[in-house]
Amino acid sequence: MLNRTILVGRLTRDPELRTTQSGVNVASFTLAVNRTFTNAQGEREADFINIIVFKKQAENVNKYLSKGSLAGVDGRLQTRNYENKEGQRVYVTEVIADSIQFLEPKNSNDTQQDLYQQQVQQTRGQSQYSNNKPVKDNPFANANGPIELNDDDLPF
């Protein structure tokens, strides 16, 4: 028997993190997954699938994913049931995730800004050890006319 589910979609809400009585972290969220075909109006419909994830991965999901985040989920399909306050039997189908892939950075603007700041700091650090000479952006900025190069001057 095989019970394997692989999904890629966007979160419809922020993950909800809770802890069981035995101390296990559990996160839940809903993933919107587009169908591969279009309806009569030419629009793609989506399925909204409940996802449950446990332990350390639940903490990571809560920390790094939010509404609108693109995520990949690998897990198994599970149906559970319970009796509601009115005495009716309620069935819930959800995916129990074995693995969650974060398919985009939490905030790409922050990440790009951090990388830029690191590069600036590295450049400043290098200039301290090169006789404090400023690095010119364009070494040919003061050239008056064409620059002559021979094939022997090229490193390739």
UniProtKB/Swiss-Prot annotation:
InterPro entries, sorted: NA-bd_OB-fold, Primosome_PriB/ssb, ssDNA-bd
GO molecular function terms noted in the UniProt entry: single-stranded DNA binding
Motif Important for interaction with partner proteins: where in chain: 151-156
Positions of region (Disordered): 104-156
Transmembrane segments: none
Domain of life from the UniProt record: Bacteria
GO biological-process terms attached to the record: DNA recombination; DNA repair; DNA replication
Gene3D superfamilies the UniProt entry points to: Nucleic acid-binding proteins (2.40.50.140)
GO cellular component: nucleoid
Compositional bias of kind Low complexity: 112-128
Keyword annotations: DNA damage, DNA recombination, DNA repair, DNA replication, DNA-binding
Domain SSB: 1-104
One Pfam family per UniProt: SSB
Function per UniProt: Plays an important role in DNA replication, recombination and repair. Binds to ssDNA and to an array of partner proteins to recruit them to their sites of action during DNA metabolism.
SUBUNIT field: Homotetramer.
Protein name, entry field: Single-stranded DNA-binding protein 1
Originating gene: ssb
